[in-house]
Amino acid sequence: MKSEIKKNDIVKVIAGDDKGKVAKVLAVLPKTSQVVVEGCKVVKKAIKPTDDNPKGGFIHKEKPMHISNVKKA
């Protein structure tokens, strides 16, 4: 599906928990018709301990949302 929304565009979220937020597009996923928007749909993800990070812990990461839930601002 062809989309007007590209990476680094400024968009407004029109549906969901983050409705009304204006933010930058970090990635576009054309196969699934989804976009990753900066600061929207943030989840807390557990990280297992590794050699680089011996304690492990949690990180906050943006999850994709459907492209129909955003419009260009």
Swiss-Prot record:
Entry GO terms, CC: ribonucleoprotein complex; ribosome
Any GO molecular function: rRNA binding
Biased composition range(s): Basic and acidic residues: 51-65
A Gene Ontology BP annotation from the UniProt entry: translation
Alphabetic keyword roster: Ribonucleoprotein, Ribosomal protein, RNA-binding, rRNA-binding
Location of region: Disordered: 51-73
Pfam families per UniProt: KOW (PF00467), ribosomal_L24 (PF17136)
HAMAP family: Ribosomal_uL24_B
Assembly, per entry: Part of the 50S ribosomal subunit.
Recorded family membership: Belongs to the universal ribosomal protein uL24 family.
Function according to Swiss-Prot or TrEMBL: One of two assembly initiator proteins, it binds directly to the 5'-end of the 23S rRNA, where it nucleates assembly of the 50S subunit.
Protein name (Swiss-Prot/TrEMBL): Large ribosomal subunit protein uL24
The encoding gene: rplX
